[in-house]
Amino acid sequence: MDETKSELLRKYEQKFKALADQKRLEIMYELCQRGKTCVCDLTEIFEVTQSKLSYHLKILLDANLITKETKGTWSYYDLNDEEVNGLLSEELCCIFRKKGEGDCC
């Protein structure tokens, strides 16, 4: 496997690991429903400490599944629609396409 494909698979591994947690899926769902949301509101919604919530938000940020905007002392998070919508994209499907089943990438 060449380095490019290896890097691509690592990128998807990080995203799927981030999604492999119910709390993070719940966070993403709330952001999808609410749009840009202050971390202070998220702590109330999920009834967790800010440090525990920050742990999950960092994993989602590192996987590029959410975005963060800082205004003053508060951080606002939103779903990265483009990244989430492309997660099960043609690109990923092509990686696992059997040889001889046509070109797609």
UniProtKB/Swiss-Prot annotation:
Q: Which UniProt keywords apply?
A: Arsenical resistance, DNA-binding, Repressor, Transcription, Transcription regulation
- Please cite one Gene Ontology biological process associated with this protein: regulation of DNA-templated transcription
- Read off the Gene3D superfamilies from this record: Winged helix-like DNA-binding domain superfamily/Winged helix DNA-binding domain
**A Pfam family reported for this protein in Swiss-Prot or TrEMBL:** HTH_5
| One annotated GO molecular function | DNA-binding transcription factor activity
Question: DNA-binding region at which residues?
Answer: 39-62
Tell me where on the tree of life, at the top rank, the source sits.
Bacteria
Q: Where does the HTH arsR-type domain lie? A: 4-99
Q: Does the keyword Iron-sulfur apply?
A: no
Known function: Transcriptional repressor for the ars operon.
NCBIfam families (alphabetical): HTH_metalloreg (NF033788)
Listed PANTHER family: ARSENICAL RESISTANCE OPERON REPRESSOR (PTHR33154:SF18), TRANSCRIPTIONAL REGULATOR, ARSR FAMILY (PTHR33154)
Protein name as catalogued: Arsenical resistance operon repressor
